[in-house]
């Protein structure tokens, strides 16, 4: 499929316009691209290895790489000594039911009857009248300039951060961190202490879990320590060989449940209330699941405790094992992402072999057509990662947020931003998303 002209321009508009659409910072989230593979982003250093990454938010915003399955998102930093994954759950919001003083906004009697009129007015080109009707009938109590409304409305928030210390202390060479858009696999490779280390991570939609595997070309080299931190009111505990973190959002009582299991090849695994410790293993696969008790049930917006479903989901994923989980994930993702290819010209091989951050800087002066193709495909990747059947829609930052009080609460702006997230779904052949 060769996409040119208006489709190309629409994609650029959708990716860039509005500042905080699905790709609110695609120029920042587009770190480094592939040597010989036109669908791979790659770095020659960890996310926190850049001069502007001394501030954690800069490393997150500009250099970490995103994974997601619509329900669960992660930003990966790729440090040799410690892997850092910032985590998101698609329904983790503050505010709303449970906050003192909150009450459901009353329905506007007769509002639904005005929707056909608003649509016809728009089709007739009378935007001023359509705006006036929408303002009158399609509205509700939301955030504004008053602090009390912002508190009641709440915000989309981070769950917290997963850290996996590797014990790597020797100098590191041949470092490469990559995200293959065609498979949605994140990899880290490097040499240290005479061994070659490899990590593979992905967020599976079929099995609703995050998977991170640590391996090396020498036996017994995996000595890992996993811990999880969160700004919410949560506590960790060991439960039947699984590390469980449970609690609530402080202001509204939304229940949170995240579970991590480990599959070790050789060595020993110890699970405690503080995390997971693996010693002298040949390879280790961590599997993480998570959820909240949010449900689309007015007016409480609460459903079943997520613990039972997470316990069942994690057990099923651990039974499948790494190879089968990966196979199912890649097949699911590629069935969507592999539908569309673009050809807007070619870039010399010597340029395509550069890390993408270098290519981005170079592109300011010398056009890189293959980089534009990569940009297009990265947009499709992010829509797949942040919006899948059954999940909430992509918000102002898709699925990824590392704060408690983010810009515009990373909510759903119906004036234009939510629509912009999904403009590319047609030209990108992703209508299921």
Roles of regions detected by a PLM:
Residues 34-433:
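Aromatic-residue-lined binding/catalytic grooves and analogous aromatic/hydrophobic interfacial grooves
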Residues 1-11:
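N-terminal secretory signal peptides that target proteins for export/translocation
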Residues 17-28:
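Bacterial N-terminal signal peptides
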């Amino acid at each position: 499929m060769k996409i040119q002209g208006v489709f190309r321009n629409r994609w650029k508009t959708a990716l860039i316009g509005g500042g905080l659409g699905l790709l609110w910072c695609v120029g920042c989230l587009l770190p480094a691209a592939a040597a010989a593979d036109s669908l791979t982003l790659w770095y020659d250093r960890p996310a926190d290895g850049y001069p502007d990454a001394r501030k954690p938010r800069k490393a997150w915003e500009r250099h970490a790489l995103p994974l997601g399955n619509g329900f669960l998102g992660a930003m990966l930093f790729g440090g040799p000594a410690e892997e850092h994954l910032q985590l998101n759950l698609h329904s983790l919001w503050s505010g709303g039911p449970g906050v003192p003083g909150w009450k459901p906004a009353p329905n506007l009697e007769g509002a639904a009857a005005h929707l056909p009129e608003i649509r016809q007015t728009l089709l007739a080109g009378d935007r001023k009248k359509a705006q006036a009707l929408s303002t009158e009938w399609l509205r509700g109590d939301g955030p504004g300039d008053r602090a009390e409304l912002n508190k009641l409305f709440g915000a989309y928030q981070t769950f917290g951060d997963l850290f996996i210390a590797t014990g790597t202390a020797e100098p590191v060479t041949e470092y490469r961190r990559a995200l293959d858009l065609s498979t949605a696999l994140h990899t880290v490779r490097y040499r240290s202490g005479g061994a070659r280390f490899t990590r593979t991570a992905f967020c599976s939609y079929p099995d609703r879990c995050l998977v991170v595997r640590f391996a090396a070309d020498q036996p017994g080299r995996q000595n890992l320590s996993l811990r999880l931190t969160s700004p919410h009111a949560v506590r960790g505990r060991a439960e039947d060989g699984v590390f469980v973190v449970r609690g609530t959002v402080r202001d509204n009582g939304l229940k949170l449940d995240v579970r991590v299991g480990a599959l070790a090849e050789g060595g020993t695994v110890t699970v405690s209330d503080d995390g997971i410790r693996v010693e002298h293993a040949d390879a280790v696969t961590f599997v993480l699941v998570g959820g909240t008790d949010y449900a689309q049930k007015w007016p409480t917006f609460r459903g079943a405790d997520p613990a039972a479903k997470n316990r069942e989901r994690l057990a099923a994923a651990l039974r499948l094992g790494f190879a089968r989980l990966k196979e199912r994930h890649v097949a699911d993702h590629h069935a969507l992402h592999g539908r569309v290819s673009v050809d807007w010209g070619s870039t010399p091989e010597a340029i395509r072999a550069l890390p993408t951050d270098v290519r981005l800087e170079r592109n300011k002066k010398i056009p890189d057509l293959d980089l534009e193709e990569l940009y297009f495909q990265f947009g499709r990747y992010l829509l797949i990662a942040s919006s899948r059947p059954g999940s909430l829609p992509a918000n102002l930052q898709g699925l990824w947020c590392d704060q408690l009080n983010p810009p515009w609460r990373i909510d759903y702006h119906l004036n234009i931003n939510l629509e912009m997230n999904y403009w590319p779904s047609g030209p990108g052949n992703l209508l299921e998303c």
